[in-house]
C-alpha cells in the first residue's frame, strides 16, 4: 500500500469533542460532540424514519427524545459499540470517505490500557478495513505541533487533564500525572455558582448555555484574592449575557471564580493538586538533568487552557515553585484547542513517517498486539 498518493485521515477522539480531517490540512474539517444517542422509547417516532442511534450534533439536537451517552470517559474509551458508531459517523457522514482507501492515525490518552490500544487496532482493521493504521499519544502530538520534541505538556480538555513530560519525542511514563478535573467540571461548577446568584440552569440544554458563557466570559485571575477584592468594590468586571429567550443576565466574579478551580480544586470537593502544582510534581519526578528543558518548554494544549490569563498565571505559579535561578517559559499557542489534531496532521504527512504505519498485511500476520511494537 503506497501512502503517498492518498491523504491519511487524522482523528482525535476527545471525551467531549471528536476532531477529524485530512493529514496535511491546518485544521480539522469536522468537529462534533463525542456522543451517541438512542431513542428512549422504541416506536415513538414510527413513520418518521427513526434510526436506532444518532451521533454528534444530531444526537445533541434530538436529545429530548434520546438517552445520551459519552463513550469516552476521562479520555479513555469505555464503550466500544458506541465508539464504533462514532468512527462510522466520522468516516461516512462527516468526512465522506471510504475508510478502506485511507491510512488512519488515531490519538489516545496517556497511559491508555494495552487492551484498549489492541481493541482500537482490531476495530479499525477488521470492521473498517483500513489499509494502514497508527496510534499516537495526544500530548506528544501537541508538543510536535508547537515545533518541539522535548517539553512538558499540560493537556486539558473536556473530560480529563494530563501533565506529560516528553524527552526527545518519547513520553516519560513514570512522571505522567492525570487530574480528573477538566472542562465539564468547570461548566458544572459555573452552573452551581450562577444558581447562588439566582440563575438556575438544570437541563442539558441549559448546560450548553452555561458552557457558552464559560467559553465567552470566563478568565483566570493573576491574583485571585486581589481580583475578588477589586470585584467587590467595583462593577468593572461585570458582563451581561443574553440568553436564547432574550433574558439578559449579569455575571461578575463568577467569571474568574469558575476557572480558579483549575488551580485550587477544593470547591469541587477534590483532594487533587491544581494544574500548577501537578505540573511541578511531574517535573520533579523526572531526572534532574532534563528538568531545565522541561521548565523552559511548558506547552499548554486543549480547550480548557483557552481562558485568557491562564498562561500568565501559570508562569507566576511555576516560577514561585521552581528553583530561583530557573528560567520558566509557558507556551500557549493560539490554536491550542486543536493542537493534538494539528500535531497528528503534521506527523502523518511527514515523508519519514510513512514507514511507521502498521499495514493491513502486518496486522494480518501479527494480530492486534503489533500496535505495541510499532506505536510507542
From Swiss-Prot:
Keywords: ATP-binding, Cytoplasm, Cytoskeleton, Hydrolase, Nucleotide-binding. Its main location: cytoplasm. GO terms for molecular function: ATP binding; hydrolase activity. The keyword ATP-binding applies. It is found in: Cytoplasm, Cytoskeleton. It is an enzyme of class 3 (hydrolase). Its EC number is 3.6.4.-. It catalyses: ATP + H2O = ADP + phosphate + H(+). CDD domains: ASKHA_NBD_actin. One of its GO terms (cellular component) is cytoplasm. PANTHER family: ACTIN. Actins are highly conserved proteins that are involved in various types of cell motility and are ubiquitously expressed in all eukaryotic cells. Belongs to the actin family. This is Actin.
Amino acid at each position: 500500500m503506497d501512502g503517498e498518493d492518498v491523504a491519511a485521515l487524522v482523528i482525535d477522539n476527545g471525551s467531549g469533542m471528536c476532531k477529524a480531517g485530512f493529514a496535511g490540512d491546518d485544521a480539522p474539517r469536522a468537529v462534533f460532540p463525542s456522543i451517541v444517542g438512542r431513542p428512549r422509547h422504541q416506536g415513538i417516532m414510527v413513520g418518521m424514519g427513526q434510526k436506532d442511534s444518532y451521533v454528534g450534533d444530531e444526537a445533541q439536537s434530538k436529545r429530548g427524545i434520546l438517552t445520551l451517552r459519552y463513550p469516552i470517559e476521562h479520555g479513555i474509551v469505555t464503550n466500544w459499540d458506541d465508539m464504533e458508531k462514532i468512527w462510522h459517523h466520522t468516516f461516512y457522514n462527516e468526512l465522506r470517505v471510504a475508510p478502506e482507501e485511507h491510512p488512519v492515525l488515531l490519538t489516545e490518552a496517556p497511559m491508555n490500557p494495552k487492551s484498549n490500544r489492541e481493541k482500537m487496532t482490531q476495530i479499525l482493521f477488521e470492521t473498517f478495513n483500513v489499509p494502514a493504521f497508527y496510534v499516537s499519544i495526544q500530548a506528544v502530538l501537541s508538543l510536535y505541533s508547537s515545533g518541539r520534541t522535548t517539553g512538558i505538556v499540560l493537556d486539558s480538555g473536556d473530560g480529563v487533564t494530563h501533565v506529560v513530560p516528553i524527552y526527545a519525542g518519547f513520553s516519560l511514563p513514570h512522571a505522567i500525572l492525570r487530574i480528573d478535573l477538566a472542562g465539564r467540571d468547570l461548566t458544572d461548577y459555573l452552573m452551581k455558582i450562577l444558581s447562588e446568584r439566582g440563575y438556575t440552569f438544570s437541563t442539558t440544554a441549559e448546560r450548553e448555555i452555561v458552557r457558552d458563557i464559560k467559553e465567552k466570559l470566563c478568565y483566570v485571575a493573576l491574583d485571585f484574592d486581589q481580583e475578588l477584592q477589586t470585584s467587590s468594590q467595583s462593577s468593572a468586571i461585570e458582563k451581561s449575557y443574553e440568553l436564547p429567550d432574550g433574558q439578559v443576565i449579569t455575571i461578575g466574579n463568577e467569571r474568574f471564580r469558575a476557572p480558579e478551580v483549575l488551580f485550587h480544586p477544593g470547591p469541587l470537593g477534590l483532594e487533587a493538586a491544581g494544574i500548577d502544582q501537578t505540573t511541578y510534581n511531574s517535573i520533579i519526578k523526572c531526572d534532574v538533568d532534563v528538568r531545565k528543558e522541561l521548565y523552559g518548554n511548558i506547552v499548554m494544549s486543549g480547550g480548557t487552557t483557552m481562558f485568557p490569563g491562564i498562561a500568565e498565571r501559570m508562569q507566576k505559579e511555576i516560577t514561585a515553585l521552581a528553583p530561583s535561578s530557573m528560567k520558566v517559559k509557558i507556551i500557549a499557542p493560539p490554536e491550542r484547542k486543536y493542537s493534538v489534531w494539528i500535531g497528528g496532521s503534521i506527523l502523518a504527512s511527514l515523508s519519514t513517517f510513512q514507514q511507521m504505519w502498521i499495514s493491513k498485511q502486518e496486522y494480518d500476520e501479527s494480530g492486534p498486539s503489533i500496535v505495541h511494537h510499532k506505536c510507542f
